[in-house]
Swiss-Prot record:
Keywords: Glycosidase, Hydrolase, Manganese, Metal-binding, NAD
Protein name from the UniProt record: Phospho-alpha-glucosidase PagL
Higher taxonomy: Bacteria, Bacillati, Bacillota, Clostridia, Eubacteriales
E.C. number: 3.2.1.-
Family assignment from sequence similarity: Belongs to the glycosyl hydrolase 4 family.
UniProt source species: Clostridium acetobutylicum (strain ATCC 824 / DSM 792 / JCM 1419 / IAM 19013 / LMG 5710 / NBRC 13948 / NRRL B-527 / VKM B-1787 / 2291 / W)
Subunit field text: Homotetramer.
């Protein structure tokens, strides 16, 4: 069986340790020869790299090569897979996005609203430059992109690399939601198969099927979830803001009686309520910096000081979180041509036959060694079509603004966003966001 070479782009990320653990767990199905960590933040990556040395010595001794580097040629040359998870500006810029949005009376969120717009205009140039570099050194490698905001990034990669079917854009949020459903049902997520349509962070489950029996659990789940439930899943989702998000799902299910919504729809359907719940002095970015990110690096530093994982409380388990599972499972499906079903962000091309053909939709797809094959969704009701067309117009204009350096397109994008709408507010937001993002955004004229 072939052994693959992979590069984790964003090697210093707090998500990387779980990804490395998942690669250990998956080594029989997805054997590796070489793992490269690439990041432009050498200090953070040094910590992850030293942790990786200990991890692989104990759990993956047959791995031939592990390196970490800030040099693109060294990182990207002759790789089979690039797993991308970059955050342009890191969490400090996310904090600015959220607090500037709240200052102007809009909700402050990472990927939605004005915060997501700002993040998108930082991410797109960085992702495009990295993909061009990867293609210089490994023209045929698979690029599996997790970088947020995934909807805007996917729209940009479609335009700049229109015929590159080996670029696949994904998001783990629907899978995280399915973990909740599985826990409610007393099942495992891998026992379930979703039918789903929408845009990234903007979609609906129409069926939750039992893979063995074909039973559709959606009606049962809707009834259960009309009342908030406290479900124990991975530690990240036990944080206060995530618990609040999952609890609010019951509000959406009671108000809209057809499907099961992606949790991010709370920001678009109840923007004032979401804004009023937020603390303008301490946002989700602060919570992450003080919580999960800090804890992740503290854990790695402790392992490095111990020099081992075996025989400590940090012993590797099979529970690594959906973020790591999803991208490694996707790479495994491509490598082994399994034709498994994944939720992928892909060009519509008639998959949903009554929305724009060029729309970047998030739908179930079969995935194998030839790439992604979307499964037909058909027509969707007017309410969902209207929401999606409006949101996609915002996403398109955001990418236009970035690639063309157009202030007018940026203003139009923000006014179309359901969390902003007001032109005067959008102008003030843009003024502050342009100032905050100097050095990250392409200049707007």
């Amino acid at each position: 069986m072939k052994k693959y070479s992979i590069c984790i782009v964003g090697g210093g990320s707090r998500y990387t340790p779980d990804m490395l653990a998942m690669l250990c767990n998956q080594k029989e199905r997805f054997p590796l020869r070489k793992i490269v960590l690439y990041d432009n933040e050498s200090e953070r990556q040094e910590t992850v790299g030293n942790y990786a040395k200990i991890l692989f010595k104990e759990y993956y001794p047959e791995l031939e090569e592990v390196i970490w580097t800030t040099d693109e040629k060294e990182a990207f040359e002759d790789i089979d897979f690039a797993l991308m998870q970059i955050r342009a500006g890191r969490l400090k810029m996310r904090e600015k996005d959220e607090k500037i949005s709240l200052k102007h009376g809009c909700l402050g969120q990472e990927t939605c609203g004005a915060g997501g717009f700002a993040y998108g205009l930082r991410s797109v140039p960085a992702v495009i430059d990295l993909i061009k570099s990867i293609r210089t050194y490994s023209p045929k490698c698979w690029i599996l992109n997790y970088s947020n905001p995934a909807a805007i990034v996917a729209e940009a990669t479609k335009r700049v690399f229109p015929n590159d079917y080996r670029i696949i854009n994904i998001c783990d949020m629907p899978i995280a939601i399915m973990d909740i459903y599985a826990a409610v049902l007393g099942l495992k997520r891998r026992d379930l198969e979703p039918k789903y349509f929408g845009l990234n962070h903007f979609g609906w489950f129409t069926h939750i099927l039992d893979k063995k029996t074909g039973e559709n659990y959606l009606p049962k789940l809707r009834e259960i979830l009309k009342t908030p439930v406290d479900v124990q899943t991975e530690p990240l989702f036990q944080e206060k803001s995530w618990k609040s998000t999952f609890e609010f799902m019951s509000q959406m299910i009671n108000d809209y009686d057809e499907y099961l919504p992606n949790t991010y729809l709370q920001y678009y359907l109840y923007p004032a309520k979401m804004r009023n719940k937020e603390n303008p002095e301490y946002t989700r970015a602060n919570e992450v910096m003080d919580g999960n990110e800090k804890e992740t690096y503290e854990r790695m530093h402790k392992i490095i000081s111990l020099g081992k994982i075996h025989g400590t409380k940090y012993e590797l388990t099979s529970d690594v979180g959906c973020h790591a599972e999803y991208i490694v499972d996707l790479a495994t499906a491509i490598a082994n041509n399994t034709n498994e079903i994944f939720l992928i962000i892909t060009e519509n091309k008639g998959t949903i036959n009554n929305v724009s053909k060029d729309m970047m939709v998030e739908v179930p797809c079969r995935v194998g060694s030839n790439g992604v094959e979307p499964l037909v969704v058909g027509s969707i009701p007017a309410f969902y079509k209207g929401l999606m067309e409006n949101q996609y117009a915002y996403e398109k204009l955001s990418v236009d603004a970035c690639l063309e350096g157009s202030y007018q397109k940026a203003l139009q994008a923000l006014v179309l966003n359901r969390t902003v709408v007001n032109t005067d507010v959008a102008k003030e937001l843009l003024k502050d966001l342009i100032e905050a993002n100097k050095g990250y955004w392409n200049e707007l004229h």
